[in-house]
Amino acid sequence: MEKLSNIHPGEILLEEFIKPLNISAYRLSKELGIPQTRTSEIIKGHRSITADTAIRLSYYFGNSAKFWLGLQNDFDLEEEKKSKYQEFKHIKRLNEHAA
């Protein structure tokens, strides 16, 4: 079974919020009170969603900051697991040491 690719929260912001609501990145930036470069970098997957940005997005879209931080956290965990797989796979579970 093929594993799905890791989706950056910026892609979700773009595809599930900005496009369907017909909002420009410029307008979103102005409404949130953040630089347009921050919004553009998030959408392109070049920047993480910080706690500050998560709170601003939650106020604007009416969802929770935990939603946005959860997306970012899930993305970061998957990226870390992929990048350090060889290192992590050599760690033995605690119960394997006792055997």
What annotation goes with each model-predicted range?
Residues G33-I49:
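Recognition helix of helix-turn-helix/homeodomain-like DNA-binding domains
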Residues S24-S29, T39, L57:
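Short alpha-helical "recognition helix" segments of helix-turn-helix
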Residues L69-A99:
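Short, charged recognition helix plus adjacent turn
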Residues H46-Y59:
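Short, basic-rich loop-to-helix N-cap that marks the start of a DNA-contacting helix
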Residues P20, E31, Y60:
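Residues within the alpha-helical elements of helix-turn-helix
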Residues P35, H46, F61, Q72-F75:
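The DNA-recognition helices of helix-turn-helix-type DNA-binding domains
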Residues M1-I23, G70:
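A short, Lys/Arg-rich alpha-helix, primarily the initiator
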